[in-house]
């Protein structure tokens, strides 16, 4: 009996360890000024609690944004965001990584506003070598205007994982053997912004921004950056292969994470470029390998 209980305990510990091992490290929340600087329209950024929380304001004159001080090759980046409440049609709240040249790499979270009572749409995209057109859109399973939620990117040599409250919503694998470009040698800064995009953001541009509701306000906190900092000209990370996100358990999702991703895919996906045969009669190679992600 004792030996059976011991075996059961060992199995449970093993299962718990395997379920936890692939979860990104817990983000470290820091004040805005630790990692970030304003990018434009400085007077449209409001600071609270010693810079631990900020607001971005959008009016008919301008939006605003901020970026990291450094550029990074691989890492874990997250932001706690509370979206613009009420009638947010035409607005875009963005959290993304991007390099700085014509053939740039980019990893995007874009939150598309909507009319009061209609759900936000989260659009993700990946650019490699200046080419994007890899849009996926989902509804969120909560109201992102009521409370802060954490949006994260885990980026290593093997995959890019988009996470919402630590739940994977998308994976972009390194499939260089198929000729698919992958972001691996262009340092990227992290950018956050609130701006008007009523020419496309809501119902393809049919719903315009109602400026009588301005200013539109998005709230940010957390400001977590755990990446390998590189100069803009550097094409490699000095500690490549040695950071926690490079280890074996982060080269793929574990079984629990795959189930959560499948749940998002089945319940909340409203557009996936991999299933758009009108747009892509010949599926992109990454879609032929991984149509479910």
From Swiss-Prot:
It catalyses: breaks a beta-(1->4) bond in the backbone of a xyloglucan and transfers the xyloglucanyl segment on to O-4 of the non-reducing terminal glucose residue of an acceptor, which can be a xyloglucan or an oligosaccharide of xyloglucan. Disulfide bonds join 228-237, 274-287. Induction: Up-regulated by indole-3-acetic acid (IAA). Effect of IAA is not affected by mannitol. Not up-regulated by fusicoccin. One of its GO terms (biological process) is cell wall biogenesis. Pfam families: Glyco_hydro_16, XET_C. Contains at least one intrachain disulfide bond essential for its enzymatic activity. It is found in: Secreted, Cell wall; Secreted, Extracellular space, Apoplast. Residues 23-220 form the GH16 domain. Keywords: Apoplast, Cell wall, Cell wall biogenesis/degradation, Disulfide bond, Glycoprotein, Glycosidase, Hydrolase, Secreted, Signal, Transferase. PROSITE patterns: GH16_1, GH16_2. One of its GO terms (cellular component) is apoplast. The record marks 108 as: Important for catalytic activity. Its EC number is 2.4.1.207. Glycans are attached at residue 114. Residues 1-21 form the signal peptide. Predominantly expressed in the phloem fibers of growing internodes. Weakly or not expressed in the xylem. In the internode, it is expressed closer to the bottom of the internode compared to XTHA. InterPro entries: Beta-glucanase/XTH (IPR044791), ConA-like_dom_sf (IPR013320), GH16 (IPR000757), GH16_AS (IPR008263), XET_C (IPR010713), XTH (IPR016455). Its main location: secreted. Xyloglucan binds at residues 110, 123-125, 133-135, 199-200, 204, 279. The active site is at residues 106, 110. Catalyzes xyloglucan endohydrolysis (XEH) and/or endotransglycosylation (XET). Cleaves and religates xyloglucan polymers, an essential constituent of the primary cell wall, and thereby participates in cell wall construction of growing tissues. Belongs to the glycosyl hydrolase 16 family. XTH group 1 subfamily. This is Probable xyloglucan endotransglucosylase/hydrolase protein B. It comes from Phaseolus angularis. The lineage of its organism: Eukaryota, Viridiplantae, Streptophyta, Embryophyta, Tracheophyta.
